[in-house]
Amino acid sequence: MLDYRQKIDALITKIEKARTAYSRHHIVKIVAVSKNASPEAIQHYYNCSQRAFGENKVQDLKTKMHSLEHLPLEWHMIGSLQENKINALLSLKPALLHSLDSLKLALKIEKRCEILGVNLNALLQVNSAYEESKSGVVPEEALEIYSQISETCKHLKLKGLMCIGAHTDDEKEIEKSFITTKKLFDQIKNASVLSMGMSDDFELAIACGANLLRIGSFLFKE
């Protein structure tokens, strides 16, 4: 059985070391990625004071939210959003969508938000590793698309950027993708959230300025 307290304490220790090396004033938030976890495991981490959880699929988000509705949890949608799932996602009112990966998707979401009279907080996903397997806008177009969404999608509240580190064992390449995203983030007025870093690379992400981490296997793997 997982020792939940031991796991989260080990994570926080690593985060604190990386955070204070970057800046004593830097604040880092953890989103526990619970896509393969049971509601019981989430409950255990809630008992350890973890509040934000993320899911990859809308249906899984719905299931977990309903089974844990008695807890004051903050839910994030971190996986790619299919257009036919927009209504379902909006009905769940997540705290944040991390994976807004195109202007086209933004316009589709905006249209549904307007009809339903709701807003959605989101991050623009940047494919800073230039990998075909990853979603997101290319860095060269990111600022222009961010601006377009901000101006044309009044119900979509952009809060910053998200990226997934390069899929490689070469730490320099991973760092490069994080630095690329951080440089873009620094050019966006009023951007507050930089979602970078997962279980294998969160310390490097913090060193590059991440303030929101998406941690799955570190917390939930046996």
UniProtKB/Swiss-Prot annotation:
GO terms for molecular function: pyridoxal phosphate binding. Transmembrane segments: none annotated. GO terms for cellular component: cytoplasm. CDD domains: PLPDE_III_YBL036c_like. Keywords: Pyridoxal phosphate. The modification N6-(pyridoxal phosphate)lysine is found at K35. It comes from the Bacteria. Pfam families: Ala_racemase_N (PF01168). SUPFAM superfamilies: PLP-binding barrel. InterPro entries: Ala_racemase_N (IPR001608), PLP-binding_barrel (IPR029066), PyrdxlP_homeostasis (IPR011078). Pyridoxal 5'-phosphate (PLP)-binding protein, which is involved in PLP homeostasis. Belongs to the pyridoxal phosphate-binding protein YggS/PROSC family. This is Pyridoxal phosphate homeostasis protein. It comes from Helicobacter pylori (strain ATCC 700392 / 26695). The lineage of its organism: Bacteria, Pseudomonadati, Campylobacterota, Epsilonproteobacteria, Campylobacterales.
